[in-house]
């Protein structure tokens, strides 16, 4: 049994590290074999809830201590997360005169919390992983208020947004699963520790299923507007990382911490954006497309950014450990 867990753990680490490539492969398969993945769109909220539960299982009480022990960087990251990406999303939609569905999808991505993949990318970049984890936790736990509020304020020009319905959606697919995961980890910490290397696999499988489903049911529309969405998504992501890094430098934050902030700001929980689009904006089916394409793109750009930052000044002092 122990050997089996080790093998599964290695597979989990491999899949997590190369999630961008895996998403691309499954997206291509789903594009051509649409019937094989279309069914997953009926379970988008369940998949994202499972992914969030998996994230919760990895969070320990010590992680919250780290959050409160470094309030300056956490606050800077939090403010950057919920200002830069939403405002850039809104600006791009206005600048490029996006149709309603796509504008809504881009704004949904911009208003979501940081994605869990950012922690892996931060590690690869030689950034401060503890800070990255802390920012992901705080932005995720604040999402039931911040995400609906920002979507209500920014997307109202395109569609009618029900603030309360969105709050309920985020609570169901994010807050409850994450808190449940944290509670189980707190009660059964030793047992969870034994399978800790396997846990990322839960999120990987869930996100791959979500994106594959969206690609399969929107294949024809991807052909007609995929390049436009990719261009907007790429600009959105690169602006987020660039402005996040610039803000960190302006505030004289250390190299490895600035790396973590830039990655955290630029990489979003796009799976949540897809789930919210599916649950709350059924009349705007293309609103799921920016989230799906963002999921592919930000893993690619994040990995490239990590390679650049890892080879830069300051990486020798980088915090590569989750604990300090």
Where are these regions (language model features)?
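Alpha-helical transmembrane segments of multi-pass small-molecule/ion transporters
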Residues: 1-324
């Amino acid at each position: 049994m122990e050997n089996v867990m080790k093998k599964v753990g290695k597979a989990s680490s491999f899949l997590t590290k190369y999630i961008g490539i895996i998403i691309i492969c499954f997206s291509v398969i789903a594009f051509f074999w649409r019937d094989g993945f279309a069914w997953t769109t009926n379970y988008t909220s369940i998949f994202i809830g499972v992914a969030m539960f998996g994230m919760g299982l990895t969070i320990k009480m010590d992680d919250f201590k780290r959050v409160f022990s470094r309030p300056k960087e956490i606050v800077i990251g939090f403010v950057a997360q919920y200002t830069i990406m939403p405002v850039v999303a809104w600006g791009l939609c206005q600048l490029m005169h996006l149709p309603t569905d796509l504008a809504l999808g881009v704004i949904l991505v911009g208003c979501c919390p940081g994605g869990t993949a950012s922690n892996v990318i931060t590690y690869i970049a030689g950034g401060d992983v503890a800070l990255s984890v802390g920012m992901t936790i705080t932005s995720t736990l604040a999402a039931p208020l911040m995400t609906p509020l920002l979507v209500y304020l920014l997307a109202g020009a395109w569609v009618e947004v029900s603030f309360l319905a969105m709050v309920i959606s985020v609570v169901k697919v994010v807050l409850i699963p994450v808190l449940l995961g944290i509670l189980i980890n707190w009660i059964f910490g030793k047992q969870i520790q034994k399978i800790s290397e396997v846990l990322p696999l839960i999120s990987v499988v869930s996100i791959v299923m979500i994106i594959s489903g969206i690609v399969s049911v929107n294949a024809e529309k991807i052909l007609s507007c995929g390049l436009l969405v990719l261009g907007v998504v790429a600009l959105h992501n690169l602006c987020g990382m660039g402005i996040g890094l610039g803000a960190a430098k302006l505030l004289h934050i250390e190299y490895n911490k600035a790396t973590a902030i830039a990655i955290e700001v630029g990489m979003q929980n796009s799976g949540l954006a897809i789930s919210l689009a599916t649950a709350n904006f059924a009349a705007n089916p293309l609103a799921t497309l920016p989230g799906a394409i963002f999921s592919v793109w930000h893993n690619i750009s994040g990995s490239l950014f990590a390679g650049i930052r890892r080879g830069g000044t300051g990486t020798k002092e980088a915090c590569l450990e989750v604990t300090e």
